[in-house]
A protein has these predicted regions:
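Membrane-interface helix-boundary motifs at transmembrane edges
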Residues: 9-21
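A structural signal for short, hydrophobic/glycine-enriched beta-strand patches
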Residues: 37-196
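Residue-level signal for protein termini and structural transition zones
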Residues: 16, 29, 46-48
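Membrane-embedded alpha-helical segments of integral membrane proteins
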Residues: 1-11, 222
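The feature marks non-catalytic terminal segments
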Residues: 213-222
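Internal/C-terminal transmembrane anchor helices
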Residues: 18-40
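Short hydrophobic alpha-helical membrane-anchoring segments
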Residues: 4, 32-41, 205, 209
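A transmembrane-helix-recognition feature enriched in membrane-embedded lipid enzymes
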Residues: 190-214
Length: 222
């Protein structure tokens, strides 16, 4: 609506000189953003779980007091569906206690799965993490205590938009055989979640790849 109201002065400014170059930069930026948006949308479905995983790690996504948010419920349902087909798998649920939450996310996630029928002894509860990286790092430590090493196949359970970056972080913290289980997402959350994820992926490429020696933005595809 801004352009509709001020289109004449904007067109005049962009006709030549600095304005023209700013217009070019703007449209180039929009083009790059759209390419990255498409990359994130497609790549979330790569690296799918094979059914051979020894453990799956469900990443936290917020609570409403002590009830899983819609995003988190979808992740837990995806984990439960995998469990039904692979009943021997160990499920690590991860997440600390954030603002407005009355219990740690990991505790609420374990309760949700137990109510569905997953045995308590097959659930590993992590309840201190505050980020995706910590989710996976702390889960790795707890799984190792259970005798599941970082060299054994595992899968990250998260919403599709988040799968690529989650696989990258899993490898960053030391997991060697990483796949993912993409959960669905509500239609009202698609655009904001994918747009936000573009910037999160850029942050990872700029600030995290140097920690592992990775230089390719394609890390995490396989």
């Amino acid at each position: 609506w801004v352009y509709a109201v001020f289109h004449r002065p904007i067109d005049a400014f962009c006709a030549d000189g600095v304005g023209r170059w700013l217009k070019i930069l703007f449209f180039c930026g929009v083009g790059v953003f759209c390419l990255l948006l498409g990359f994130v949308a497609v790549i979330g479905y790569a690296g799918a779980a094979t059914g051979q995983e020894k453990a799956i790690v469900v990443l936290g996504a917020g609570l409403r007091k002590d009830v899983p948010s819609d995003l988190l419920r979808r992740r837990l349902d995806a984990a439960y569906a995998y469990y039904l087909e692979n009943p021997e798998v160990v499920i690590a649920v991860t997440g600390g206690q954030g603002n407005g939450e009355t219990i740690p996310e990991g505790v609420a996630m374990a309760r949700y799965l137990e109510e569905k029928g997953v045995p308590e002894e097959q659930i590993v509860v992590e309840q201190k993490s505050t980020s995706t990286e910590e989710n996976l790092l702390f889960a790795k430590e707890l799984l190792e205590e259970r005798g599941i090493g970082a060299d054994e196949p595992m899968a990250v359970v998260t919403n599709a938009f988040h799968c690529y970056r989650a696989r990258c972080y899993a490898r960053l913290v030391g997991f060697e055989q990483v796949s993912s289980i993409p959960a669905s997402i509500g239609l009202n959350s698609v655009l904001p979640c994918y747009m936000r994820e573009v910037f999160a992926v850029l942050y990872y490429w700029v600030f995290k790849t140097s920690q592992s020696g990775w230089i390719s933005p394609l890390v995490g595809i396989l």
